[in-house]
Amino acid sequence: MAKTSAVEKNKRREKLVKRHADKRARLKAIVMDQGLPLEERFRATIRLAELPRNSSKVRIRNRCEVSGRPRGYYRKLKMSRIALRQLGSLGQIPGIVKSSW
């Protein structure tokens, strides 16, 4: 089980990303638009830098919903390899069975 503080910190980051997503996208569009004057694009860059660091999507870490583990994460199932093996062997995940041949 991961530290509760790490899991909560990641949840706070997810909330910040949602809150600032529109503003961040608008500013990024201005910065990337080559047709706009350089001064306006520079102002947008400064305003983008003033946003909280944790409002950037790259700061979010994919974590297992069962254990909170950050590594060995399967995106489709939103869980780690260890939780997948445990729940799969117990038959609690539909369609997952232990392989035997």
UniProtKB/Swiss-Prot annotation:
PROSITE patterns with a match to the protein in the record: RIBOSOMAL_S14 (PS00527)
InterPro entries hit by this protein: Ribosomal_uS14, Ribosomal_uS14_bac/plastid, Ribosomal_uS14_CS
UniProt-listed Gene3D superfamilies: 1.10.287.1480
Pfam families: Ribosomal_S14
Domain of life: Bacteria
Keyword ATP-binding: no
Swiss-Prot/TrEMBL keywords: Ribonucleoprotein, Ribosomal protein, RNA-binding, rRNA-binding
GO molecular function: rRNA binding; structural constituent of ribosome
A Gene Ontology cellular-component term: cytoplasm
PANTHER family, per the entry: 30S RIBOSOMAL PROTEIN S14, SMALL RIBOSOMAL SUBUNIT PROTEIN US14M
HAMAP family: Ribosomal_uS14_1
NCBIfam families linked: PRK08881.1
Name of the protein in its database record: Small ribosomal subunit protein uS14
